[in-house]
Every structure is written in C-alpha cells, then in structure tokens.
A protein has these predicted regions:
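Mid-domain Rossmann-like dinucleotide-binding core that forms the NAD(H)/NADP(H) cofactor-binding site
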Residues: 136, 143-145, 149-234, 238-239
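Glycine-rich cofactor phosphate-binding loops and adjacent beta1-alpha1 units
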Residues: 175-179, 191, 201-202, 212, ...
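C-terminal hydrophobic helical "lid"/dimerization subdomain
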Residues: 246, 250, 262-266, 310-361
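Glycine-rich beta-strand-centered segment in the early N-terminal region that forms part
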Residues: 21-35, 46-96, 101, 147-151
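Rossmann-fold dehydrogenase core element
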Residues: 272-273, 287-329
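Residues located in well-ordered beta-strands
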Residues: 2-4, 14-19, 31, 62-64, ...
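Cysteine-cluster motifs in flexible loop/terminal segments that predominantly coordinate metals
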Residues: 85-143
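Residues in the short beta-alpha loop(s) of Rossmann-like NAD(P)-binding domains
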Residues: 9, 213, 280, 305
Length: 361
C-alpha cells in the first residue's frame, strides 16, 4: 500500500510502498476513505514532540472495515467507522473511572515480541498515535474506532476523528460550559472553530473568537461567534475584558503557545476557568501571576476533548446531520495523498481550516 512516511524531523513526508500485517485477534483492518490533515501532525514533523521514526503520520480519519480479527465482535466487514487516537484498554484505572481519553495502556498496540503492524521489508515502520491514517490501509485495535451511520459523508466524518471531538469535547466535557456564560476562544484553526461551534451548541451567551486572520474570524462568525477580535490590531486581553465587563467565565487556548496560554488566563473573570487545548512545545514554561489564584481562577488541560468517543462521535454525527454541527465550512480543500506535503505547508501559513485527503482520488 502507499503511505506518507516521515523518516526524519523537519523533512517532507515521502510517499512509499509499505506492507501491513494481517489482523490479530482484536485488530481491525480499515480502508480509509478520508483523512484530515491536522496541525498536530506538524508538531511531530518539526520535532516539537519527539516520536519514534520512521512513522506514517495522520490521525484523523474515517473509512470502511475491510477485515476483522478472530475475537472482534463490535464491527464487521463493510461497516463505516471513525478512528480515534485515544484508544482505550477498558480496564485500567483511567478507563474504569470514566477517563478513557487518558488511557495509556500498551495493549492497544502490539507487544515488542510481536511482528509490527507496519513494515518495509525488515524495517519496522512505527504506528503513529495508534492509527497512521496517511495510508491506503490502517490496522488498528478494535478500541480505536467507532461505528457510524452510513448516511454520514466520510470527509465530514473524518473531522470528527480529531478536531471536532477535541474542540467540542473541551467545551462539553473538560470545561462544562454552562448556558448563558461568556466564552473566548484563542485560535480559529480546526480545533478552535470546533470549540466555538460547541460553545454555541452549549448555549453560551457571548462567544468571542480571537485570531489574526480575517478569513478565519469570518468563518468563526458562521459557526457561532458573536464577536471577533483581531489580535494583531489590538490588545486582545483588554478587548475581551471590555466586551465582557470584567472577563470570561470560560476561555480556550487552541494554538499551543506560551503567550496565548497566558492570555487565556488573563481574560478570565474571578472564578473563571481556562482550558488549554493547544499542544504547547515540550520544555515550554508558562508564567501565571500567583495572586490570581485568590480570585479562584482555574487553568486546566484537555486531551482529545476528555472524550468517551464511542458515545461522543455518533452524537456528533447526529449533530451534523441535524444541522447543529457545522462541518461543511471547515473543509478548505480535498486533496490526494500525493499532495499531503502541500497541505502541511498550507497549515503553516495559518490561512486554511482543513485539507482532507480523499483516497478515491
């Protein structure tokens, strides 16, 4: 099969022929139909988050089941599925206490003594975040996918595999945004836009989108933002405090920078909560004024929207088909696998929301 392989940090992906194993007892072979090109992939490409190489990138996909292992009963050949990087074992402490997105059990992968899922001759190709979706086939644990209804368009379904679940889930689960509350979202990429859409679904009052790209701010309005702030033209913190008469109940950082994380904290009203969704580079320290804790302000992280994806993702599919979740506007362009490097380069400019690889092209 063809796959986009990362062999060295800060180098383009190479389209190569890679071999894939047969499904083990609890594994599922999936033929991707669509895969989103996510900004998170860039963090691993540029070395901000070190990863075992070579690897096949990609972690946001939807496809059709091709084959299942002998012990798999949840899906069968022909089922439509969304994949999820936060595969769960189902019996560790995180899983049994309801925190499935924090499961780190190695059993959702193959053990060192087993043959690798992906290889090129004698060379192991490491699987990326339990998935590796920039490939014509995926071999994954049965707990890394969820069945969906067949009338859901696959390119839209792919977005639910990461950006939508991460952004909407941060609003619903991590922060628990309440109706009528004021919200600010810093960064209007795929995840930030999903958080804005989620805040609108949750019934937030004022929803403030903060970015430096006019086209993204306009897109944010179509997804539910009531106000927009161009952070390149003003003091974003001051503007938010003036609009809200003292600060937001909830803020979301969706870029992954020290400065914007600190701004998310500064935009809070007393008692407010800042949720950091963005991937801050390893080794980066964030500075907060300690006295602010006396105002009962809170800051927290969010991993994949604190999801329970087998419950959440089918609901998000229904939200889309019922007109609540707006995914059509999120797709900037459909591309071929061979165009993945151009899509990743476009992400670096910050101009586009999402490129989606379509494997029938």
């Amino acid at each position: 099969m063809k796959a986009a392989v990362l062999r060295e940090a800060n180098t383009p992906l190479e389209i190569e022929e890679v071999s894939i194993s047969k499904p083990g007892p609890r594994e599922v072979l999936v033929r991707p139909v669509a895969a989103g090109v996510c900004h998170s992939d860039l963090h691993f490409m540029d070395g901000s988050y070190p990863y075992a190489l070579p690897t096949i990138l990609g972690h946001e996909s939807a496809g059709i089941v091709e084959e299942v292992g002998s012990d798999v009963t949840y899906v069968k050949k022909g089922d439509h599925v969304i994949t999820c990087l936060s595969a769960f074992c189902g019996h560790c402490d995180q899983c049994i206490t309801g925190h499935l997105s924090l499961c780190a059990s190695p059993e959702v992968g193959r053990m060192p003594e087993e043959a690798p899922r992906l290889h090129k001759g004698d060379e192991t190709i490491h699987q990326f975040l339990n998935l590796s979706s920039f490939a014509e086939l995926m071999l994954i644990h049965e707990h890394a996918l969820v069945k969906i209804r067949e009338d859901m368009p696959m390119d839209r379904a792919a977005l639910i595999g990461c950006s939508t679940t991460t952004g909407v889930g941060a609003v619903f689960h991590t922060a628990g945004v309440e109706p009528g509350s004021n919200v600010a979202v810093i960064g209007c990429g795929g995840v930030g836009l999903a958080a804005i859409n989620g805040a609108a679904i949750a019934g937030a009052g004022m929803i403030i989108a903060v970015d430096m790209v006019d086209s993204k701010l306009e897109l944010a309005k179509s997804l539910g933002a009531t106000h927009t702030i161009d952070a390149g033209q003003c003091d974003a913190v001051g503007e938010v405090k003036e609009l809200t008469q003292g600060g937001c109940h909830y803020t979301f950082e969706a870029i992954g920078l020290k400065a914007t994380t600190e701004q998310a904290w500064q935009m809070l009203r007393p008692g407010g909560a800042a949720t950091v969704i963005g991937m801050i580079p390893v080794g980066t320290m964030v500075e907060l004024h300690g006295v602010d804790f006396l105002a009962e302000k809170k800051i927290q992280g969010s991993n994949m929207g604190s999801n329970r994806f087998r419950v959440d993702m089918p609901r998000f599919v229904d939200f889309y088909l019922n007109g609540k979740l707006h995914l059509d506007q999120m797709i900037s362009k459909h591309i071929k696998l061979s165009e993945v490097n151009e899509a990743l380069a476009a992400l670096k400019t910050g101009q586009d929301a999402r490129h989606v690889i379509m494997f029938d092209q």
